Amino acid sequence: MIVTAIIHLKIKEEVKNKSKYMIAKQLIEPKSIVVVGGSDDIHKPGGTVLRNLQDGNFKGSLYVVNPKMDEVQGIKAYRDVKDLPEVDCAILAIAAKFCPSTVEVLAKQKNTKAFIILSAGFHEENEEGAKLERQIVETINSVGGSLIGPNCIGVLTNHYSGVFTSPIPELNPQGVDLISGSGATALFIMDSGMQKGIKFNSMYSVGNSAQLGVE
């Protein structure tokens, strides 16, 4: 028997006390998304999530940043985030050490308010990674933004498939919202639940829960 409950994204108390923070609309329903680290290789997170965004129901503007490519999966690739236009939501699939500076540019120069960091190598590994994570959270808080992750599989909603997994489960607007620290657990729950007739409206894999977590 699967027990379902109403679960809400919650700001970690230590974060809430330092910033006037609300969950950004750009995370729930972005009008533009950039995949930083997008790849032609669909076996890599940056390749899989880009393919899912294109194959899914995202209707907004989609951008890619890849320093070595002019085009990725048929989309013009920017060599540097500094060259991007303003963008609502950024999905990062790059090495952890590059994430703080990338977030800094997007948040401060590109008016980006929603961040989904797929990359691992943060506080789950060592203190150096924890420091990188804190830098990212501080930057995002300073602009009133939202962060999912790091170290997660992404976000799946009726507006966009920002996850690096396949196949993509079928969603239903009348279903429940699932939030999980573990992406693998979330997918297992969805698969098992759907077999029993449970419908899902969205899935948020919060990973390390550096800013947003589970209440």
Q: Whereabouts are the PLM-identified features?
A:
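Catalytic-core regions of core metabolic enzymes
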Residues: 5-7, 11-215
